Amino acid sequence: MAIKLEIKNLYKIFGEHPQRAFKYIEQGLSKEQILEKTGLSLGVKDASLAIEEGEIFVIMGLSGSGKSTMVRLLNRLIEPTRGQVLIDGVDIAKISDAELREVRRKKIAMVFQSFALMPHMTVLDNTAFGMELAGINAEERREKALDALRQVGLENYAHSYPDELSGGMRQRVGLARALAINPDILLMDEAFSALDPLIRTEMQDELVKLQAKHQRTIVFISHDLDEAMRIGDRIAIMQNGEVVQVGTPDEILNNPANDYVRTFFRGVDISQVFSAKDIARRTPNGLIRKTPGFGPRSALKLLQDEDREYGYVIERGNKFVGAVSIDSLKTALTQQQGLDAALIDAPLAVDAQTPLSELLSHVGQAPCAVPVVDEDQQYVGIISKGMLLRALDREGVNNG
């Protein structure tokens, strides 16, 4: 994947004459020691990240770790003290104010924790407000605002007012307002933190669905570990202004960089964080491709050659058809029937988004590995009993 957003050796030091801090940084003094000596606050220290196009990249850490400062450096709401912020290879730390406005209008948008909706304006007008300030004509901004509201499921509330909406719906308006400019990059600063847990989960699911359709580059700030694990393709952990580890949720869980990260991830409920798609294994063994010339005899030979009791049938477009067994294929052959007649009732396929906690009974009772499919019924892979147990055992390994 191409790199969409990159930061190199980025610093933010708050206070007058911030350059004074660098000699102490070079001497290895801590954030607290620098503050004591100079009165300067080290917000971000020598951060470097490369964020790929189309990924959800989560930055997390405890309060004061620098994560909210970091996200504001990415669109220059806060000016960096030193370092580069590259969008599509262009260092926005060096561009003019006019060029920066164009970047904010067309390439990058932000969603805050506070909904920040205008109470006297309708949902539609709130959604279009940023475009109005940018000078976009009324017809175009109305069309784009309605499209953004459709994306978040609020098109029927276009003429309602903010006080007529629930908290979750108001945050959807905030998200729609950012989506209306169709940005390449979406910055989200603890956007769901103020919501009730159930609504927060719904919004996380909504974001994942939107991402599947539009593949924007999303930088998501969070202090909620479960949230980060649920939505993040990769996670960066910050401590005292520094990025101490970057990796996939799985990589960080299995190989924490230090005690801070290890403590951060202690007690995470693997069964709630990971879903079927995260552990499903796609293997060519036992995979039967349904074509006009491929019947029960060919399928039976394939399974016997691979020494497998069960197989999984897919057709054109990778669409999952069902499972077969050696016995069901032999029966279909005896009765001179086609491959469809050999399909067995179990195991039923599970949705790729199913949490591991909901798979235990299904996988445990299935006669073979359980097939996993996406929302379009496309084959994702299989989950065996051993695979599920190994995935769930990672929590014990990390906490032991």
Curated annotation (Swiss-Prot):
Topology in membrane: Peripheral membrane protein
SMART domains hit by this protein: AAA
Alphabetical UniProt keywords: Amino-acid transport, ATP-binding, CBS domain, Cell inner membrane, Cell membrane, Membrane, Nucleotide-binding, Repeat, Transport
Residue ranges annotated for the CBS domain, each copy included: 282-341, 343-400
Positions of ATP binding: G61, L62, S63, G64, S65, G66, K67, S68
Residue ranges occupied by any ABC transporter domain in the UniProt entry: 29-265
GO cellular component terms, A-Z: ATP-binding cassette (ABC) transporter complex; membrane; ProVWX complex
Pfam families: ABC_tran, CBS
Location of this chain's protein in the cell: Cell inner membrane
Task of the protein: Part of the ProU ABC transporter complex involved in glycine betaine and proline betaine uptake. Probably responsible for energy coupling to the transport system.
UniProt protein name: Glycine betaine/proline betaine transport system ATP-binding protein ProV
Organism: Escherichia coli (strain K12)
Gene it is expressed from: proV
